[in-house]
Swiss-Prot record:
Pfam family, one: G3P_acyltransf
GO molecular function, one term: acyl-phosphate glycerol-3-phosphate acyltransferase activity
Natural source organism: Burkholderia cenocepacia (strain ATCC BAA-245 / DSM 16553 / LMG 16656 / NCTC 13227 / J2315 / CF5610)
Protein name: Glycerol-3-phosphate acyltransferase
Catalytic activity: an acyl phosphate + sn-glycerol 3-phosphate = a 1-acyl-sn-glycero-3-phosphate + phosphate
Gene: plsY
Cell location: Cell inner membrane
Length: 213
């Protein structure tokens, strides 16, 4: 019962879509209506509002971090922490508050990894930054970081074995790659948008939806 309750709370925390909330508060178009239609920081950046994108990034990462931190703060066993990690991540992917139309989980996964172990989170984030800096593709950076996260985990803690948190990290990585399957096709076809690209639809949407709740 304790694990179920912790996972439920984590899922609800993850279901808060900061991309949608921040955009609404700042009078911007719903990020699900333009660009990649993904409610995440990279797509919010396409609106041209860097502040909104940063707030989205921080908010999505924070909810992943706080869910796992709380689980450990209250002394829950590793199996509960693992389920909390997966639940908050799934909450972001399929948020109950937003008709289950969620993001791809990059920032939330980063927050989870930082809470699991700061070095694990920082190593994965650094991997994302390096790939993003050289190639300017957020999706490619996310895919590479997702592949390397379990590898970093093995280097830090050894093979997963009976460590449920390590298996949770692996599960999140697999889910994150699966959520980027459309991006993989675009990358292979040379049609993927680069970081910082602004969509005319975003600007038009912002002008039309500005001031709406």
């Amino acid at each position: 019962m304790q694990i179920l309750l912790a996972a439920l709370v984590a899922y609800l925390i993850g279901s808060v879509s900061f991309a949608v909330v921040v955009s609404s508060v700042m009078g911007l178009a719903d990020p699900r209506s333009y660009g990649s239609k993904n409610p995440g920081a990279t797509n919010v950046l396409r609106s041209g509002n860097k502040k909104a994108a940063i707030l989205t990034l921080v908010g999505d990462a924070f909810k992943g971090w706080i869910a796992v931190w709380l689980a450990r703060h209250f002394g829950l066993p590793d199996v509960a922490v693992a389920w909390v990690a997966i639940a908050v991540f799934l909450g972001h992917l399929y948020p109950v508050f937003f008709r289950f139309q969620g993001g791809k989980g990059v920032a939330t996964a980063a927050g989870v990894l930082l809470a699991v172990h700061p070095v694990l989170g920082l190593a994965t984030a650094l991997t994302w930054l390096i790939v993003a800096f050289f190639f300017r593709y957020s999706s490619l950076a996310a895919l590479v970081a997702a592949v390397f996260a379990p590898v970093f985990d093995v280097f830090l803690f050894g093979t997963p074995g009976h460590n449920p948190v390590a298996w949770a990290v692996l599960a999140m990585s697999v889910l994150l790659v699966w959520r980027h399957r459309g991006n993989i096709s675009k990358l292979l076809a040379g049609q993927e948008s680069r970081i910082g690209d602004k969509k005319k639809a975003a600007a038009d949407g912002g002008a039309q939806d500005g001031g709406k709740a």
